[in-house]
């Protein structure tokens, strides 16, 4: 009897799912829902030079490193992408990503367009990039206000930055307008399912098809 989940057992290479959006467009919520609903997807843990905060755990929230350690990683090409933000450095470590891909595990990257560009320069064939847009700038402002996290001046700065980020939408493989969170999540989930089935990500298909053609039916 052929097992019902035979297709999922065919060996495949993992993928790197890149999610980007301006602040308030829903990226973090969609990413969290993906991680909670899909055990085959794991969040890429960044390296940072910023000090650890109270409840943060090494290797779970970040890999905390000194500036000297960070520079050593950068200079030895151990980072896939990096950026300096407010005086602290953040980066994606190469080794965990490459290991996950080889083992058929998928990694989620919650990064901006600059980080996405750097990842594509080094790992283009493995990347599935999705940009999430708000339905309108007015709605984006309303969402930022509803979060009640920032002063008005900060919100205006976020909106200005959002326009700059949105300018890069054409650099992504897929673009989703998040006017309904459930629908946007379903669309992202559908992209992940389809991309996992791409022939070039499933090297195990060669052995499977070879065995299929050699199989005797009598």
Curated annotation (Swiss-Prot):
Which superkingdom heads the taxonomic lineage of this protein's source? Answer: Bacteria
Write out the GO MF terms: ATP binding; guanylate kinase activity
Could you say which residues bind ATP here?
A: 21-28
- SUPFAM superfamilies the record matches: P-loop containing nucleoside triphosphate hydrolases (SSF52540)
Query: Where's it mainly located?
Result: cytoplasm
Question: What catalytic activity is recorded?
Answer: GMP + ATP = GDP + ADP
Q: Which UniProt keywords apply?
A: ATP-binding, Cytoplasm, Kinase, Nucleotide-binding, Transferase
Which locations, inside or outside the cell, does it occupy? Cytoplasm
Report domain Guanylate kinase-like positions.
14-193
Q: Which PROSITE patterns match?
A: GUANYLATE_KINASE_1 (PS00856), GUANYLATE_KINASE_2 (PS50052)
Q: Which GO terms describe its cellular component?
A: cytosol
EC number(s) given by UniProt: 2.7.4.8
Report the InterPro entries cross-referenced here. Answer: GK/Ca_channel_bsu (IPR008145), Guanylate_kin-like_dom (IPR008144), Guanylate_kinase (IPR017665), Guanylate_kinase_CS (IPR020590), P-loop_NTPase (IPR027417)
Family matches, as PANTHER family: GUANYLATE KINASE, GUANYLATE KINASE-RELATED
- Quote the function comment for this protein: Essential for recycling GMP and indirectly, cGMP.
Family, according to the entry, reads as follows: Belongs to the guanylate kinase family.
Q: Which NCBIfam families match?
A: guanyl_kin
Instruction: Please give the name of this protein.
Output: Guanylate kinase
Q: Which organism is it from?
A: Mesorhizobium japonicum (strain LMG 29417 / CECT 9101 / MAFF 303099) (Mesorhizobium loti (strain MAFF 303099))
């Amino acid at each position: 009897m052929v097992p019902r989940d035979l297709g999922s057992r065919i060996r495949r290479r993992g993928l790197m799912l890149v999610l980007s959006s301006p602040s308030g467009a829903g990226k973090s919520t969609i990413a969290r829902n993906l991680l909670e609903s899909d055990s085959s997807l794991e969040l890429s843990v960044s390296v940072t030079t910023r000090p650890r905060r109270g409840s943060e755990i090494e290797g779970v929230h970040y890999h905390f490193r000194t500036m000297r350690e960070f520079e050593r990683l950068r200079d030895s090409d151990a980072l896939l992408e990096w950026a300096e933000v407010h005086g602290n450095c953040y980066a994606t470590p190469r080794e965990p990503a490459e290991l996950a891909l080889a083992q058929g595990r998928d990694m989620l990257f919650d990064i901006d367009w600059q980080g996405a560009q750097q990842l594509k320069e080094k790992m283009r064939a493995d990347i599935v990039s999705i940009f999430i847009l708000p339905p309108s700038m007015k709605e984006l402002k309303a969402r930022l206000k509803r979060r009640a996290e920032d002063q008005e001046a900060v919100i205006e700065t976020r909106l200005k930055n959002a326009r700059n980020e949105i300018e890069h939408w054409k650099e992504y493989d897929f673009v989703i307008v998040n006017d309904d969170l459930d629908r946007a999540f379903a669309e992202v989930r559908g992209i992940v399912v389809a991309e996992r089935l791409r022939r070039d990500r499933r090297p195990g298909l060669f052995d499977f098809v070879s065995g299929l053609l050699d199989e005797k039916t009598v």
